[in-house]
């Protein structure tokens, strides 16, 4: 990933249906959304792909990215409750919103070893492999279908997974990935 096109930050959310009707106030400060502007939150959950901030500074703009995500969440729920989704969601209520964003990237620190896709796919053995993982490399990009209304700051992503990872075997992450090669006494994780 380059500085333009970083992966973003997610703010997940959840909703439920109550036994009786639940009101929801208009949210003029939220993003102006209708049901077609976002994927329907199946299973009462807005998952990881409610993500924005791709071309923003993940540290300097962290609060702005989070605020945009929250405006998207509340705008989507407003569409469900007060706009074209209102008939179907009379009993729906917002039950949880992650007010702390989950960033995918921040500083790009380098250890003595940089684990590559080739290392993972070829099951390269490292003598200091200390953390097992079975997750493939995935990159997140704005989903074009939902980026039309806010092309400069889309808030729905999709993931592209790299070459297959043998999930039964996984791969060991070397200890040398976790400390900085040029900043003394700095240990990294994430």
Enumerate the predicted regions with their spans.
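Flavin (FAD/FMN)-binding glycine-rich loop and adjacent Rossmann-like elements that form
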Residues: 1-189
């Amino acid at each position: 990933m380059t500085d333009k096109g970083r992966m973003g930050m997610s703010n997940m959310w959840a909703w439920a249906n109550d036994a009786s009707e639940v009101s929801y106030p208009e949210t003029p400060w939220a993003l102006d959304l209708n049901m077609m502007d976002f994927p329907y939150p199946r299973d009462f959950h807005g998952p990881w792909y409610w993500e924005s901030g791709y071309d923003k500074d993940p540290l300097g703009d962290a609060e702005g990215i989070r605020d945009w995500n929250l405006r998207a969440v509340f705008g989507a729920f407003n569409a469900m409750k007060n706009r074209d989704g209102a008939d179907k969601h009379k009993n729906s209520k917002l039950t949880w919103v992650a007010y702390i964003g989950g960033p995918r990237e921040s500083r790009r620190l380098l250890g003595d070893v940089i684990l590559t896709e080739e290392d993972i796919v070829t099951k390269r053995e490292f003598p200091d492999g200390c953390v097992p993982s079975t997750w493939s490399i995935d990159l997140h990009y704005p989903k074009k279908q939902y980026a039309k209304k806010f092309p400069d700051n889309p808030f729905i992503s999709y993931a592209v997974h790299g070459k297959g990872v043998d999930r039964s075997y996984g791969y060991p992450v070397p200890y040398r990935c976790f400390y900085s090669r040029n900043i003394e006494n700095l240990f990294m994780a994430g």
